[in-house]
Amino acid sequence: ALKAEKYSETDHSGIYTLDIQPYSYQQEILDKLEAERAVRGHTRNLVVAATGTGKTVISALDYKRFCKQHPGKPCRLLFVAHREEILKQSLYPFRAVLKDANFGELLVGNYKADSIDHLFISIQTFNSQDFTAKTGADFYDYIVVDEFHHAAAPTYQKLLEYYQPQILLGLTATPER
């Protein structure tokens, strides 16, 4: 419980006992992701949805499904964003969906991670710590890049070119940027 609170000014402990169910539009996106992967073999996907529609919840539900489909695997997760606040906010949907108040570690700003298996990291920290030197190309099974419209920037190229996850999921409200 202490670890869950170290990233927060508010108490979120009650949400870790609830079943998080997707809204119908979120379920439609989840179904489309599953079809793209199963039918077409596309494992690098982009979710485009308006701000506030729960793209992070969609990614957490999709990650949970991925883990259920791969029992016995470590299901290592790398969640990348360009701002600390986004990373802090993104932890809660994953913890709620997975019902695990201790899931995930922040590696951004003054936060130091004890483990890199389920990591929420800023792209700046990723690059400044030469993270690819610490992990193999297939270390992460599932990678989420939030605000994916930033991925065209040079700062994201090392990440996207190096890693070979089973799933790469981009999230954005504005793909045209």
Question: What feature does the model see in each segment?
Answer:
Residues 117-130:
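Conserved helicase/translocase P-loop NTPase motor core
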Residues 74-83:
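Conserved RecA-like ASCE P-loop NTPase motor core of nucleic-acid helicases/translocases
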Residues 1-53, 57-75, 92-96, 115, ...:
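ATP-dependent helicase/translocase motor core
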Residues 109-119:
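Conserved motor-coupling elements within RecA-like helicase/translocase cores
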Residues 39-42, 113-115, 130-141:
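Short basic/glycine-enriched coil/helix segment immediately N-terminal to the Walker B
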Residues 124, 133-176:
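SF2 helicase catalytic motif II
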Residues 84-110:
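Conserved helix-turn-beta segment of the N-terminal RecA-like "Helicase ATP-binding" lobe
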Residues 47, 119-121, 143:
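Hydrophobic positions in the central parallel beta-sheet of the AAA+
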